[in-house]
Amino acid sequence: VRGSSGYAAFASGKFALRGLAQSMARELGPQNIHVAHLVIDAGVDTEFVRERQRQAGIEPDDLPLDTLMNPDSIAKAYWDLHHQSRDGWTFELDIRPFAETW
């Protein structure tokens, strides 16, 4: 979770979600409930996203490779998180495409 110029309203809500997840993890962990905070920092390659790009004059197939995330890759990350052993739970996971510029 990163704050950035021009994104104060967005960032404050995202930081609030992170705090909520931290509190829930501490509260529910003793009951063997794994709470994790995930950040999906990219567009997801769905027909909805592709249509919005076309409306903006962008042809999705012309985007650089790995710009949009494959929904199956996101699902696998969630699945792997779900199957973690309690002695090695992940609390926070950032999922982003290789092509993202830092």
What are the functions of these language-model segments?
Residues 1, 38-51:
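Short, flexible catalytic-loop segment of classical short-chain dehydrogenase/reductase
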Residues 52-56:
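Short, hinge-like loop/turn segments at secondary-structure boundaries
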